[in-house]
Curated annotation (Swiss-Prot):
GO terms for cellular component: extracellular region. Promotes the intracellular survival of recombinant Mycobacterium within macrophages by regulating host inflammatory cytokines production and inhibiting cell late apoptosis. It is found in: Secreted, Cell wall. SUPFAM superfamilies: PE/PPE dimer-like (SSF140459). This is PE family protein PE8. Signal peptide: none annotated. Belongs to the mycobacterial PE family. It comes from Mycobacterium tuberculosis (strain ATCC 25618 / H37Rv). It comes from the Bacteria. Residues 5-93 form the PE domain. Forms a heterodimer with PPE15. The dimer forms a 1:1:1 heterotrimeric complex with EspG5. Transmembrane segments: none annotated. Gene3D superfamilies: HP0062-like domain. Keywords: Cell wall, Secreted, Virulence.
Amino acid sequence: MSFLKTVPEELTAAAAQLGTIGAAMAAQNAAAAAPTTAIAPAALDEVSALQAALFTAYGTFYQQVSAEAQAMHDMFVNTLGISAGTYGVTESLNSSAAASPLSGITGEASAIIQATTGLFPPELSGGIGNILNIGAGNWASATSTLIGLAGGGLLPAEEAAEAASALGGEAALGELGALGAAEAALGEAGIAAGLGSASAIGMLSVPPAWAGQATLVSTTSTLPGAGWTAAAPQAAAGTFIPGMPGVASAARNSAGFGAPRYGVKPIVMPKPATV
């Protein structure tokens, strides 16, 4: 059908011509019906009567067949006319759709919406809307959690660094916004009023009210350990080995529990005699 080319006007003209032919054939058959279906015997003998009956039967049978052929012809002409009209309507619809391609889609969408308007009750429609809203919120929450866990190794280091820099830039913008809000709260007039009116004290520039002599208040306190008069205790005498930490040779006691302890085990190795 993709290679079929149809001209509706030509189909209509062909149907009209075939209709004319069928009407002419029907008229001829009707004219021949009387002399061919009622034949009189040539004589009064039996043979003439049998011949007349045989010719009458053939004439009657021809009229029956021609009537059936006329019915089939009329049906064909009718079908051809309907097909021509259908092709014409389809061609006009295709032309209008090609001129505005979205009109057909819009019409189909409107038909679908109208068909499904009363399909779901209002309570189910609200439930479906809530499900869609909750699903969208869950997706957003999952995305936020993934971004928050990026520092735990879920993302490569480069992507994590880019995310951190982006967050840092947003924080800096937030601080600038806070400073701007503070300036707006203080007002421009209050800030400009105090400019250039402070007096200098040393290397500082302070308001005039601060230029007076300040009273210094200080108290002395005794440092801990300042009253110690006893001599520092002397370490116990012991035997030390060069290269080892100094530890007493006394027996073990509970004071050294938990501290590292070192032991020395002498190793005696024979030396080869040399001559």
